[in-house]
């Protein structure tokens, strides 16, 4: 089952959780190691540049962007390649649909993390719809479209691609509605794989606890207001601010900078934080797993429904901050007895749906 091969800690942890869950259910599985030519190295930087209006004004600006970002992109790519090899069971490297067609399995499964959303170039990739699979069963667990604003033409194309699946369960409640709109049968909304494992289970991966009290920020999107709010919030509660990031350019955004930690340390920073500020779906998921007092800043793009969906499920919409002058959320503690009860029931329900998909 393919997962987006991005330099993203959450995606990597989601893949680990999926493998762990399937193996516990008695299955052997591998992650399809698929990499698009335009999503790595210099090509990824150039593709990203097309979406950066600030840098695309003239040739000099474009060159400056490439010179600044390429070394960072290359380093992150090498680090994540090493982590994928360390933590995941991978197939052979696949770069084309012909490579994908040579793979063999009893069941092909689409994973999570915006697999059915746009790629870096703004278009969807049929590989993530398992279009290369012709005579084997196809299922999807916690598949994510990432957004909701699809044209009628795109939805029509999606319907053709999804009609060959024998079973589908999705991660967001909005995706359930979109599938119904396409007349595609859906088993329902399920938990992201990272939430199928408990905080105690994830803690076994941690090698050392981070000492002291601190505010942690994990930010994926370019949002200056979030960066300023994190600094203001840390000052308000009188604690140091730590910033963990897989991208080096965030060093300018405030706080003690922790660049691309290994997964055990990344989890430890979240687990041991006093407060946790994030715009990341998987950041939110691990805040829930570790029962952290978190503050949610919704992404300033079209993918915020991912975060909103899990907050609605756990009835924690009040953790969303929109007034960046207001730090009073620091005084409102989350009732994790209630939240953990919701997650416990949802784990049981989601695992039941996954077992059903595998049996169909």
Model feature map: region roles:
Residues 32-107:
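Active-site donor-binding segments of glycosyltransferases and PAPS-dependent sulfotransferases
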Residues 165-172, 277:
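A short beta-strand/loop micro-motif in the catalytic core of glycosyltransferases
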Residues 187-195, 199, 246-247, 251-279:
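Donor nucleotide-activated moiety binding/catalytic core segment of transferases
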Residues 1-6:
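Short, small-residue-biased leader/transition segments that mark boundaries at the very start
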Residues 152-167:
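Membrane-proximal helix-turn-helix segments that form the acceptor-binding/catalytic region
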Residues 269-309:
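A donor-sugar binding/catalytic signature common to diverse glycosyltransferases
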């Amino acid at each position: 089952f393919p997962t987006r091969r991005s330099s993203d800690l959450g995606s990597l942890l989601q893949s680990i959780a999926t493998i762990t869950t399937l193996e516990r259910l008695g299955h052997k599985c591998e992650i399809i190691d698929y990499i698009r030519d335009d999503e790595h190295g210099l090509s990824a930087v150039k593709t990203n540049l097309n979406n950066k209006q600030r840098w695309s004004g003239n040739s000099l600006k474009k060159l400056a962007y490439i010179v600044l970002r390429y070394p960072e992109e290359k380093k992150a790519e090498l680090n994540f390649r090493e982590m994928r090899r360390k933590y995941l069971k991978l197939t052979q490297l696949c770069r084309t649909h012909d490579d994908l067609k040579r793979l063999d399995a009893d069941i092909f499964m689409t994973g999570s993390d915006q697999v059915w959303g746009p790629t870096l170039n703004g278009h969807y990739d049929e590989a993530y719809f398992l279009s290369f699979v012709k005579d084997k069963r196809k299922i999807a667990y916690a598949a994510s479209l990432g957004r909701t604003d699809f044209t009628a033409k795109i939805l029509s194309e999606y319907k053709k691609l999804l009609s060959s699946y024998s079973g589908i369960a999705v991660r967001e409640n909005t995706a359930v509605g979109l599938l119904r709109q396409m007349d595609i049968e859906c088993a329902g909304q399920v938990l992201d794989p990272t939430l199928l494992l408990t905080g105690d289970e994830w803690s076994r991966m941690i090698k050392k606890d981070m000492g002291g009290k601190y505010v942690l920020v994990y930010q994926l999107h370019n949002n200056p207001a979030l960066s300023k709010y994190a600094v203001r919030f840390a000052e308000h509660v009188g604690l140091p601010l730590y910033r963990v990031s897989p991208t080096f350019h965030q060093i300018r955004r405030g706080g003690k900078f922790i660049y691309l930690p290994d997964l055990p340390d990344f989890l430890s920073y979240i687990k041991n934080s006093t407060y946790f500020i994030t715009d990341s779906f998987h950041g939110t998921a691990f805040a829930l797993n570790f029962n952290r007092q978190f503050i949610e800043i919704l992404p300033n793009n079209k993918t915020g429904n991912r975060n909103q969906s899990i907050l609605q499920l756990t009835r924690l919409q009040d953790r969303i901050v929109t007034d960046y002058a207001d730090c009073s959320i620091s005084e409102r503690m989350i009732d994790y007895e209630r939240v953990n009860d919701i997650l416990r029931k949802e784990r049981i329900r989601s695992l039941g749906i996954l077992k059903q998909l595998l049996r169909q």
